[in-house]
A protein has these predicted regions:
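Charged, polyampholytic interaction/assembly segments that form long, compositionally biased interfaces
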Residues: 108-196
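Extended alpha-helical coiled-coil "stalk/arm" regions
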Residues: 29-108
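Short intrinsically disordered terminal tails
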Residues: 1-3, 195-196
Length: 196
């Protein structure tokens, strides 16, 4: 093992299980998202067709009540609602499983990240990375190991284009991502890089 590599085999069994659950949930969410989009695409097309036909007949002078009866959308609306309900029932426990893994992220991690983005100060971020490793059950890392991990992970994080309000009020054109986005991204980057 190279000098600046962290021995992740020291990770607690609970942490290892949670991180694997994060990866499995992320994959399951992606699969479900694709399934849901595939199911919704023809339903949305069907609804758009009904609405276009309705508008065409209304534009041609037919009474609204007659047009609604001629092109009912109840069946499509019910199918859309059913698809959405099924989708939400599938993703809810997966999202919860992912959020449960955020327990390993120190409370100050997001604040340290925003300080790194906004003020270009890394010290708090390095401390938060060290705390994260401790939360995983990995103690005794050197400053070099922590710095290397922080640097490797930081390459995957970023800022985003600021909203108009922030640009106008502060003259700042970039900003940190939200805490929810950061937590999800942090765990995803960590798992991609270090959990096999």
């Amino acid at each position: 093992m190279a000098k600046n590599q962290i021995n992740f085999t020291k990770m607690s069994k609970e942490a290892s299980t949670q991180l694997k659950s994060f990866k499995e949930s992320a994959l399951a969410l992606a699969v479900e998202d694709l399934r849901f989009k595939a199911e919704m695409k023809p339903l949305k097309a069907q609804l758009e067709s009904i609405l276009a036909n309705r508008q065409n007949d209304i534009d041609n002078g037919l009474p609204v009540d007659e047009v609604i009866a001629k092109f009912p959308r109840t069946e499509v609306d019910n199918a859309i609602r059913k698809a959405q309900t099924t989708h939400e029932a599938i993703i809810e426990p997966l999202n919860k499983t992912m959020r449960d893994t955020y327990a390993f992220i120190p409370e100050n991690m997001y604040l340290a990240y925003t300080k790194k983005i906004d003020e270009h100060k890394r010290g708090d971020f390095l401390t938060a990375i060290s705390d994260f490793l401790t939360n995983l059950g990995i103690d005794g890392c050197t400053q070099g190991q922590i710095s290397k991990l922080a640097e490797n992970m930081s390459d995957m994080f970023g800022a985003r284009y600021a909203q108009s309000k922030k640009i106008v009020e502060n003259g700042t054109m970039h900003t940190a991502i939200s805490k929810a986005q950061f937590n999800k991204l942090f765990m995803a980057v960590f798992c991609d890089m270090y959990i096999k």
